[in-house]
Amino acid sequence: MLFRGRKFFWGMACLQALIATTGHAEIVLHGTRVIYPSDAREVNLQLSNNGTAPSLVQAWIDDGNAKSTPDEANVPFIITPPISRVEPSKGQTLRITALPNASQLNQNKESVFWLNVLDIPPRPEGKKQENNEVLTNNFLQLAIRSRIKFFYRPVSLKENINTLSEKIQWVKNGENLLIKNPTPFYITISSIFQEINHQKIDLLKQGLMLSPFSEDQIKLKNSNITNMSFVYINDYGGRIEQVIRF
């Protein structure tokens, strides 16, 4: 019965999203990412309803497929409650618990998943006419999904998480800049700046997330790499700008 209910909510939300043209998220997440230490019994994510009407909230975790539904997601974590009604100006705590098979995840590096929160607003009430009949006009309704990163972090990783950005390796490779992550953690960079004619130019069109023990490269604007910096996003979602040292 629960399976059918969850599937129904997801289907209705998709229909609403397809026909909608505008919308505003009333459900606000208190965090831009979730870190799950492998030895934790559970971790919590707080959310609140900043709107003036109740919202139906559905939450689930996927392994990177943005099109996956709650019933298709195959991950070793569960969220309680998966569906909840959040009253206006009230909050809700989502409790995330690892299943026993989470121990089968790689214990030598972080794993990344995505946490989804679907905000399904109520149907607007029809207007009453003078004869007390309810006028039900056509309306557009939008279900808004928030999606944030969810990191599973093995406790066996002993590196200092606060100095991760200092371990990034930067190498000029012709007209490109090679970026190496020699750590077992995911590193998220929101901007890479190159100074040109005393103006900072962001070389990233969108953020860059480096997987553990991986590398990537971007194209430089010119050969001048003497004044470059980057913005690193830490565990708390804070953005920290640092000088690139070659």
Model-derived features: positions:
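Bacterial N-terminal signal peptides that target proteins for export
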Residues: 1-12
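Bacterial N-terminal signal peptides
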Residues: 10-20
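Asparagine-centered strand-capping/turn motif at beta-strand->loop junctions
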Residues: 47-51, 177-183
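Short, hydrophobic/aromatic beta-strand segments
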Residues: 53-61, 180, 187-192
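Beta-sheet-dominated interaction scaffolds and their linkers
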Residues: 25-48, 159-172
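Terminal connector regions
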Residues: 101-155, 225-246
